[in-house]
Amino acid sequence: MEMVNFIFGIHNHQPLGNFGWVMESAYERSYRPFMETLEEYPNMKVAVHYSGPLLEWIRDNKPEHLDLLRSLVKRGQLEIVVAGFYEPVLASIPKEDRIVQIEKLKEFARNLGYEARGVWLTERVWQPELVKSLRAAGIDYVIVDDYHFMSAGLSKDELFWPYYTEDGGEVITVFPIDEKLRYLIPFRPVDKTLEYLHSLDDGDESKVAVFHDDGEKFGVWPGTYEWVYEKGWLREFFDRVSSDERINLMLYSEYLQRFRPRGLVYLPIASYFEMSEWSLPARQAKLFVEFVEELKKENKFDRYRVFVRGGIWKNFFFKYPESNYMHKRMLMVSKAVRNNPEAREFILRAQCNDAYWHGVFGGVYLPHLRRAVWENIIKAQSHVKTGNFVRDIDFDGRDEVFIENENFYAVFKPAYGGALFELSSKRKAVNYNDVLARRWEHYHEVPEAATPEEGGEGVASIHELGKQIPDEIRRELAYDSHLRAILQDHFLEPETTLDEYRLSRYIELGDFLTGAYNFSLIENGITLERDGSVAKRPARVEKSVRLTEDGFIVDYTVRSDARALFGVELNLAVHSVMEEPAEFEAEKFEVNDPYGIGKVEIELDRRAKVWKYPIKTLSQSESGWDFIQQGVSYTVLFPVEGELRFRLRFREL
């Protein structure tokens, strides 16, 4: 009887820094019931990848789950596939760290009774030079999407076999994941998957269909718990697939013991198809979606899709400069601590991918994920003495000024308003300026909600869920024309209101906010100055900043004959206390964020007007819209009357 080989795999992951209740919910809704159901079907085989952050949580909170995994490995039902332990995008981290990350997860797999030889490529982000790192880590095969192969020129009917690929004389096997199976499982009735697998029968005993996708699809994604468990989809799937005489269930290692890869291919830099949309800048992403929709309307998409390519994963560092800066700080510290095992463990954690990008999940928009990355960067760097230096840290062609004292790291961008773009506390392991700017995203112009195909059978994938922006969010939606920092200098019309200011409906009279400042280093600090214009009249701003043991002191001198308000804005990463817009007068005020940056105090040498408002971004997630407080803006305001001098002190409490 003709049979088709079928490899079924899942990838289970929770980000570093995720909330404990999220981990608990995902465990109860997906990881635990999935494996307990698998235990009931001894003929069912699964290739599984668990990420390090999730395994650490399971080890500390649900150790019985590790016992179940050991039992399933021993019974031959599980093949463990590894990746970087803390789920980095391997292409985005130094080669030296890749091998350490993979070896660390291989060691965990050994403790479960399995010697792993395969890699689940995080977010399937492939670049050819990864071959050498993977082989150096003792990896024989890697799993990517069929889209990678089609981008290399292979047709769909050539994608039911693994292939070799090579770089620099090193060779590795690459398995293609079948995209059609990704959209069938588990969202459509089991019959649809079986029909598709049966249709692949053609007498070639080496032919293999591969499904390998997020384990969270089996219970965590909206609507899937009821469908997969309560309505019995998973039991039916395991029962029918494992007993079907026309389907030969296999593991990756079993396939490679019986068959050789089909030949040699060279894959381009790629990820899965959706990533090529998400990684584009917003306006280009909108055009990309329009183009895809036009091809679909003309029934040309399936035929020409292989030639439709958008951005690559590393584009996120262009799309989100805050992510780029965080990433380049991670690279900087990785290099500095390479010979310090304790410090290096922190930097390996900081390489967890989720906080660096954004697609259908929150990613870079989730403050608690960024906070976890910054915490580990700061803890790693605290093991080495950096000192003061001037260097292009984020590789944008413009120098940053890095200043360190006993308790803080401060990084200024003279070319961008002379502002303070990082103020990291060694004591608290927080970056006070971990604040994301408000951006227009291409999905803010949303289509009508999509519905499942196949006559409404099954449950919608999160890629199919249309979402309408609620009116109460639309009213508060605003976009920034600039990045957020501390000590940003504004010149405003005297009649400007708080609402105009916070909703970006005001006029910036000066060219100081993003203009270039000259600078000189002083003891424990920096002096910055700019000759510019306000309302087309000459103006000058000087600010002298000195780090102190509990924060910083800045002395301002402002000269302008224009009729204007001068404002100094401090954007602080207040995440756990939901603030409301407010206007008040004060000489001193306190900021208290108990589960975030903690308590700080801002003190002036005179009474001033203060504007406060939450910085809220709109992003999509698997559950709908997230209107997230990225931080709070505090702006102290003074009328300018020829010359203005004042002092501001920031104190960590």
From Swiss-Prot:
Catalysed reaction, written as an equation: Transfers a segment of a (1->4)-alpha-D-glucan to a new position in an acceptor, which may be glucose or a (1->4)-alpha-D-glucan
Enzyme Commission number(s) of this protein: 2.4.1.25
Top-tier EC class: transferase
Family, similarity comment: Belongs to the glycosyl hydrolase 57 family.
Alphabetic keyword roster: Carbohydrate metabolism, Glycosyltransferase, Transferase
Keyword Magnesium in annotation: no
Gene3D superfamilies (UniProt xref): 2.70.98.10, 3.20.110.20
GO molecular function: 4-alpha-glucanotransferase activity; carbohydrate binding
Superkingdom to which the source organism belongs: Archaea
Lineage, highest ranks first: Archaea, Methanobacteriati, Methanobacteriota, Thermococci, Thermococcales
Native source species: Thermococcus kodakarensis (strain ATCC BAA-918 / JCM 12380 / KOD1)
Record's protein name: 4-alpha-glucanotransferase
GO BP term, pick one: carbohydrate metabolic process
Record: active site: E123 (nucleophile), D214 (proton donor)
PANTHER family: ALPHA-AMYLASE-RELATED, ALPHA-AMYLASE-RELATED-RELATED
SUPFAM superfamilies per record: Families 57/38 glycoside transferase middle domain, Galactose mutarotase-like, Glycoside hydrolase/deacetylase
Xref: Pfam families: AmyA-A_glucT_m (PF09094), AmyA-gluTrfs_C (PF09095), Glyco_hydro_57 (PF03065)
InterPro entries: A-amylase/a-glucTrfase_C, A-amylase/a-glucTrfase_central, Gal_mutarotase_sf_dom, GH-type_carb-bd, GH57_Enzymes, Glyco_hydro/deAcase_b/a-brl, Glyco_hydro_57/38_cen_sf, Glyco_hydro_57_N
Stretches of the chain forming a coiled coil according to its record: none
